[in-house]
Amino acid sequence: MIKDIVVNLTIGVERDAAANYAVSLASIFKAHLVGVAFVYDPKVSANLIVGIPAELIEAQRAATKHLANEAVARFEELAKQAGVMTESQMIDVTPGHVGDTFGRLARSFDLSVIRQAEPNKAEQEVPIIEGALFESGRSVIVVPYVQTQGAKFNCVMVGWDGSRAAARAIGDAMPVLERAKMIEIFTVVAGPTKNTELPGIDIGQHLSRHGLKVEVKRIPAEGINVPEAILSHAADISADFMVMGGYGHSRLREYVLGGATRGILASMTLPTLMSN
């Protein structure tokens, strides 16, 4: 059951793909929705910035707060039009702590929704996604920044590699899978294999015991990178949602995204639920 959702509201944009998607998701599941807009406060680290007048720092903060207010207003209007119960929060934070802050906040919700970072822009979505994935203990749906449609589950792709993260993602995604019209479990084969057994059969049988109709397929990825192979296949079958484990590794006591996960997040074409 999905009863409450938290969405990171993107500031400084006219159309927030994450907010739009989260509102539609909350409407489908009759879930309570909380929108969070961060106000980035440079005053905390002002002692590290030599020679910048305090007035300029305060002006930067005021500008960020204005953008956060606008994001909240747009979100509340979207929710009102959809008849979704919501509340909004604005949280002061320094850029270096935004991921941890959102991760701790997301622990109290069934899942979080975050917009994909736009390429070549210095945005905070990546640390927020990392915080949600590695600090919250909950699943996160990342929405492409170009997404215009609301939540749909006509064709759901489910990534399977036998890992703990993949199993966790499938468990977290059950409310979505139960609404899916078509479910395809896919495994990626990066090169030639003599293994005649189709990976994913066991997890497919598990889902079938829940009354779900699934197909199991291999995605060949010889000669191309794994994210490219996955997203190409998603386009071929007109998938509108994907479920996968979110992978990372520890570095200096922090978790950072693994290569395949980072590749999907950089080039994603469909909303994707990730769990770790």
Named regions from a protein language model:
Residues 19, 24-28, 101-149, 233-276:
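Gly/Ser-rich helix-loop-strand patches that form or flank binding pockets
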Residues 55-70:
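A short acidic, glycine-rich active-site loop
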Residues 77-112, 209-242, 248-251, 270:
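Structural beta-alpha unit
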Residues 1-57, 135-136, 152-219, 239:
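Small/aliphatic-rich secondary-structure junction motif
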Residues 18, 98, 125-126, 166-169, ...:
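Amphipathic coiled-coil/heptad-repeat helices and related helical stalk/stem segments
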Residues 38, 89-93, 143, 186-188, ...:
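Conserved beta-strand termini and adjacent loop/short-helix elements that scaffold enzyme active sites
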Residues 13, 62, 92-95, 118-120, ...:
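Short histidine/acidic/glycine/proline-rich micro-motifs that form metal-
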